[in-house]
Amino acid sequence: DVQLFLEEKADDNIFNMVDAIVVGNRKLAFKLIEDQRRLGQEDGYLFSMIVRQFRILISMRDLFNREENISSDSMAKALELHPFVVKKSLPLIKRFSLDKLKDIYKQLLDLDIKTKTGLADQSWLIDLFVGKLG
């Protein structure tokens, strides 16, 4: 029962962690990253969730740029995303231009390459990314 509670807590907090990163709340993001690590989450998983959120934001921003008056339900259907994900992410896309989101995604790609080629530790690179983004 305790293990199940910890898994649910980790799942809830992973989304809060990603949101804190996206909105640039470094203090909260670092705290939630450490919480995730303490709960046993691997940096690879944390990284994949960060990448996933920025990929969603890029898709949404691109569609929003092409169809400014699109409803959130239509956007969810067009992008094959759950309506809750779209509604939760909609305010976030207004914080970034498509070019800015692409730049952030390129930074994430560079981080992934450095990790996979052994140039730097993924944990350190995630922390650096969060620090620079905020």
Locate the predicted segments by residue:
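Small-residue-rich helix-loop
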Residues: V2-K100
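C-terminal terminal-structure detector
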Residues: K102-G134
